[in-house]
């Protein structure tokens, strides 16, 4: 049955306009993005099918072009649309961060870092560079691959901090396993970087680990 034949109060778009996006299920939100279904399936039916195929919204959003377009109803145009929407969301978060102190809104900072790194399939190490008022200047990925004390070079981190004229920074890396518990190597790396950056008067405010669920703050865990 076409969504157009549904009662207005049950249609996803009308529900969003009346109640807000937060009131909709994942399938309803995805149906609005899809706009149309396929033969024998409404947009909502198709959305439910896709969420089942991808085992949830996260895997669907993180899928590469080949995996995404292998599903009925999803083509390159939809993939491009989705990437554009997600990038606009990331930029909106970054713009909001630049207006406020990172210390005053740590939850927003962690959500931003999660949005930047959660889709990465391999380990990535990055820095969020801040000015002397703890406002975000820029986010930069510095290393890809195995993230440990022997692979991440303090000299390069110091060099990028100096290039941005940063007063402080927040270290960040992801755990593709989804488990955010810091390893001994994570703790040792944080100590090395903190000591190296202290020599050029750049303060390390936190080290955030991104995985499944909420990002982990090493400061809040008492590990820095």
From Swiss-Prot:
Residues 102-224 form the MPN domain. This is UPF0758 protein PSPPH_0210. One of its GO terms (molecular function) is metal ion binding. Pfam families: RadC (PF04002), UPF0758_N (PF20582). Keywords: Hydrolase, Metal-binding, Metalloprotease, Protease, Zinc. NCBIfam families: PRK00024.1, radc. Belongs to the UPF0758 family. The keyword Lyase does not apply. One of its GO terms (biological process) is proteolysis. InterPro entries: MPN, RadC_JAB, RuvA_2-like, UPF0758, UPF0758_CS, UPF0758_N. The keyword Metal-binding applies. Coiled coil: none annotated. Zn(2+) binds at residues 173, 175, 186. A motif (JAMM motif) lies at residues 173-186.
């Amino acid at each position: 049955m076409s969504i157009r034949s549904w009662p207005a109060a049950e249609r996803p778009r009308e529900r969003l306009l009346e109640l807000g996006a937060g009131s909709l299920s994942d399938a309803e939100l995805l149906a609005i993005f899809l706009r149309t279904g396929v033969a024998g399936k409404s947009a909502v039916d198709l959305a439910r099918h896709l969420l089942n195929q991808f085992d949830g919204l996260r895997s669907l959003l993180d899928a590469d072009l080949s995996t995404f377009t292998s599903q009925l109803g999803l083509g390159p145009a939809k993939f491009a649309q989705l990437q554009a929407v997600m990038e606009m969301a990331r930029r909106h978060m970054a713009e909001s961060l630049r207006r406020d102190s990172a210390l005053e809104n740590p939850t927003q900072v962690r959500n931003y870092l999660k949005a930047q790194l959660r889709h990465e399939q391999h380990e990535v190490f990055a820095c969020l560079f801040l000015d002397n008022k703890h406002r975000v200047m820029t986010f930069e990925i510095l290393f890809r691959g195995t993230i440990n004390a022997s692979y991440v070079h303090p000299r390069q981190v110091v060099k990028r901090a100096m290039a941005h004229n940063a007063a402080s920074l927040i270290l960040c890396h992801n755990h593709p396993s989804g488990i955010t518990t810091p390893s001994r190597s994570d703790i040792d790396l944080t100590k090395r970087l903190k000591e190296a950056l202290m020599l050029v008067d750049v303060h390390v405010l936190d080290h955030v680990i991104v995985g499944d669920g909420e990002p982990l703050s090493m400061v809040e865990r008492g590990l820095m």
